A protein has these predicted regions:
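RNA/tRNA-interacting regions in translation and RNA-turnover enzymes
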Residues: 182
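Hydrophobic alpha-helical transmembrane segments
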Residues: 1-173, 177, 185-319
Length: 319
C-alpha cells in the first residue's frame, strides 16, 4: 500500500500539479515562517542573537511540520486504513513539484518564442531571484534551464529521498527545510544572520540528493538521446563551480547533456554577482533547451521514483 501511495502521488503531480486554489502545506509552512521570523526579529537585535533565533526558528518550523504531519497521518490511520492511505497520498503529492516546475518554465518559454520579452521577463521573475528587467533571450533561456535543473533536486529527487528515509512526515519536514531556505536563506544583509542556519541545513539536506542527481540526470540524458557521457563528465568536472555545494551538480550535468554553458554573471538585489561558468559552449543556448531540460527533469524523476521504490521493496517488502 505504501509503494502504491508513492506511485499514485507521483502520477497526480504529473497530471494535475498544484492547482492554485487548493489547500497546500507549503503555504501553511510559509505563514508559520513569517510569524516565526517576526517574533525572532522582535526579540533578537544583535547579529549573534539573530543567528541563534534563526536556529530556533528552524527547529520550530521543521519540528512542528514533522509532528503535525505524523499526528495527522496517525489519526487518519486510526480512523480507517484507507483514510490513512489517502492522507499519505495527499501529503506525498504536495511535496512533489514536477508539474509546477514544468509549467513555470513553459510560462517563460511561450512568450519568449513569441518574441514578447517583457512578458517572458515578468514570468521569469516569479521563479528566480536575479534581476530580470534587462535580460536578453539567451540570458532568459539560461536562467530557466538553471532553475529547472536545480529544482529537479529540490522539487522531486530530494522529497522522494526523504520519503524513502522516513515516510511522508519526513518528506514534509524536508519541504519545511527547503521553504525556510527559499524564504530566509539569503546572503544579503537583511537575511544573512537570521537565515544562516536555514541556508546551511538546506545544504546538508540536499547533499546526497544533489549528488544522486548527477547520476540520474546523466542516465536521463542517455534515455532522452542527449549526450550522456558528456553529462557525466561535465557534471563531475564542474560540480563545485557554484557558491552552493549542491547546485552545480544538476546544473553542470544538464549543461553537459545539452552542450551549453550555464552560470556566469547575474544581478541579485541590485548587486552584480560574478559566478563561474558551468559547462562548455559546444553551441549557443536556445529556447528549445527549455523543453529539453524539462524532458530530462521528468525522466530523471521517473528514475528516482523507480530507484527508491526498488530500495524500499528490497529493504522491507511491499508493505
Amino acid at each position: 500500500m505504501t509503494l502504491l501511495a508513492w506511485c499514485v502521488a507521483w502520477i497526480l503531480d504529473v497530471v494535475i500539479g498544484d492547482p492554485p486554489h487548493w489547500p497546500h502545506p507549503v503555504r501553511w509552512i510559509g505563514r508559520l515562517i513569517n510569524i516565526s521570523q517576526c517574533v525572532v526579529r522582535r526579540v533578537c537585535h544583535s547579529e549573534r542573537a539573530l543567528r541563534i533565533g534563526g536556529g530556533v526558528m528552524w527547529l520550530v518550523v521543521t519540528g512542528l511540520t514533522w509532528a503535525v504531519a505524523w499526528g495527522v497521518l496517525a489519526l487518519a490511520r486510526g480512523i480507517h486504513p484507507w483514510l490513512g492511505w489517502l492522507v499519505e497520498v495527499w501529503m506525498i503529492f504536495t511535496v512533489l513539484a514536477g508539474r509546477c516546475l514544468a509549467q513555470s518554465a513553459r510560462d517563460v518559454e511561450r512568450p519568449l518564442r513569441a518574441g514578447d520579452l517583457a512578458e517572458s521577463r515578468s514570468k521569469l521573475s516569479w521563479i528566480v531571484g536575479r534581476d530580470t528587467t534587462q535580460l536578453q533571450p539567451q540570458q532568459i533561456n539560461r536562467a530557466v534551464v538553471e532553475t529547472v535543473a536545480e529544482n529537479t533536486v529540490d522539487g522531486i529527487i530530494a522529497p522522494l529521498f526523504f520519503l524513502l528515509l522516513g515516510g511522508a512526515p519526513l518528506a514534509m519536514a524536508y519541504k519545511a527545510v527547503n521553504t525556510l531556505d527559499s524564504m530566509v536563506g539569503y546572503k544579503h544583509e537583511k537575511y544573512r544572520a537570521i537565515g544562516m542556519v536555514s541556508a546551511r541545513l538546506d545544504d546538508v539536506a540536499n547533499f546526497l540528493p544533489a549528488r544522486l542527481s548527477w547520476l540520474l540526470l546523466s542516465l536521463a540524458a542517455v534515455l532522452c538521446r542527449e549526450d550522456g557521457a558528456r553529462a557525466l563528465r561535465t557534471g563531475w568536472r564542474d560540480r563545485y563551480q557554484h557558491s552552493s555545494p549542491n547546485c552545480a551538480w544538476p546544473e553542470a550535468t544538464v549543461a553537459g547533456a545539452l552542450g551549453i554553458r550555464l552560470g556566469g554573471p547575474n544581478d541579485y538585489f541590485g548587486q552584480r554577482v560574478e559566478k563561474p561558468w558551468i559547462g562548455d559552449a559546444v553551441r549557443d543556448i536556445a529556447v528549445d533547451d527549455i523543453s529539453r531540460t524539462i524532458r530530462l527533469m521528468w525522466v530523471a524523476s521517473s528514475l528516482a521514483l523507480a530507484l527508491f521504490i526498488g530500495v524500499r521493496y528490497w529493504l522491507v517488502g511491499a508493505a
